[in-house]
Curated annotation (Swiss-Prot):
Signal peptide: none annotated. The keyword Iron does not apply. Component of the 30S ribosomal translation pre-initiation complex which assembles on the 30S ribosome in the order IF-2 and IF-3, IF-1 and N-formylmethionyl-tRNA(fMet); mRNA recruitment can occur at any time during PIC assembly. Residues 1-72 form the S1-like domain. Belongs to the IF-1 family. The lineage of its organism: Eukaryota, Viridiplantae, Chlorophyta, Nephroselmidophyceae, Nephroselmidales. The gene is infA. This is Translation initiation factor IF-1, chloroplastic. Gene3D superfamilies: Nucleic acid-binding proteins (2.40.50.140). GO terms for cellular component: chloroplast; cytosol. SUPFAM superfamilies: Nucleic acid-binding proteins. One of the essential components for the initiation of protein synthesis. Stabilizes the binding of IF-2 and IF-3 on the 30S subunit to which N-formylmethionyl-tRNA(fMet) subsequently binds. Helps modulate mRNA selection, yielding the 30S pre-initiation complex (PIC). Upon addition of the 50S ribosomal subunit IF-1, IF-2 and IF-3 are released leaving the mature 70S translation initiation complex.
């Protein structure tokens, strides 16, 4: 875990919303509303529907999260 109290879960982007918000279906089946982190925004990493992402969630609100990593669609050679 990066920060104390946060936990990370892998998910699949199922819908793209305005203002860099996304609906993500987590591994456990829950659907959350997630925004992209500052490092992803600063490095112009594009996230599209169908991408596998890593989300950070806080125990206070399990319906919202932050996308911290987009997994590669093809493995590196």
């Amino acid at each position: 875990m990066n920060k104390q109290g946060l936990f990370q879960m892998e998910g699949l982007v199922i819908e793209s919303l305005p203002n860099a918000m996304f609906r993500v279906r987590l591994q456990n089946g829950f659907v959350i509303l997630a925004h992209i982190s500052g490092k992803i925004r600063r490095n112009y990493i594009r996230i599209i529907v169908g991408d596998r992402v890593l989300c950070e969630l806080t125990p206070y609100d399990l319906t919202k999260g932050r996308i911290v990593y987009r997994q590669r669609s093809t493995p590196r050679p």
